[in-house]
């Protein structure tokens, strides 16, 4: 799979680089974390949310909406699923990371999606990117054997457990609050996950 750089023109349809906020303290805090063998996502990490940059992210990037800052860390090499939100997601890399990205507009009316439409991008350590609401994404992949550390910023409450049943149409994709998910048959997702990815379960080697 070709690995593009976020400076390339093809990235612009998925998101943009955030360079107006000093994220040095957040990156250095992340780099003290021990990288687990498997990929782990935590939606809210208080040590990150207390940092000065959290206020700037809330005020500048999310228009003063309450936010949560968590992380996705560990080792990951495969796509396994795609998700999208009704808002942008900010990823802040504390190691080099690879994001596999697609577009919500390419989901079929049957709520399937062909993984051959996706592109991969390298996010250099110390870099923050805003992924637009229509950008399909999932857990970042390793850019090296040492694992991956990425902070994840979203509106507060995103990825919390649902309070009501959801079935039929796009509603069937809702896996958690503000999280619509389409899984791959080989993705190893929990029972009940919506499976609709066709094509290869993309892998970064």
Regions found by a protein language model. Name each.
Residues 1-125, 138-205:
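Active-site region of the double-stranded beta-helix
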Residues 131:
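Aromatic-residue-lined binding/catalytic grooves and analogous aromatic/hydrophobic interfacial grooves
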């Amino acid at each position: 799979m070709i690995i593009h750089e976020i400076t390339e023109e093809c990235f612009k349809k998925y998101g943009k680089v955030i360079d107006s906020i000093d994220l040095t303290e957040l990156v250095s805090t992340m780099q003290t974390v021990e990288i687990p063998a498997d990929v782990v996502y935590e939606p809210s990490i208080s040590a990150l949310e207390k940092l000065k940059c959290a206020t700037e992210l809330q005020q500048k990037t999310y228009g003063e909406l309450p936010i949560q800052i968590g992380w996705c860390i560990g080792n990951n090499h495969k796509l396994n699923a795609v998700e999208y939100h009704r808002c942008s997601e900010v990823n802040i890399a504390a190691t080099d990371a690879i994001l596999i990205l697609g577009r919500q507009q390419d989901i079929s009316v049957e709520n399937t999606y062909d993984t051959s439409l996706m592109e991969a991008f390298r996010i250099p350590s110390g870099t923050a990117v805003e992924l637009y609401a229509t950008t399909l994404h999932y857990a970042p992949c390793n850019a090296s054997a040492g694992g991956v550390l990425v902070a994840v910023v979203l509106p507060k409450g995103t990825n919390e457990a649902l309070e009501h049943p959801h079935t039929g149409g796009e509603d069937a994709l809702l896996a958690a609050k503000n999280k619509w998910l389409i899984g791959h048959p080989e993705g190893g997702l929990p029972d009940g996950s919506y499976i609709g990815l066709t094509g290869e379960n993309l892998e970064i080697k």
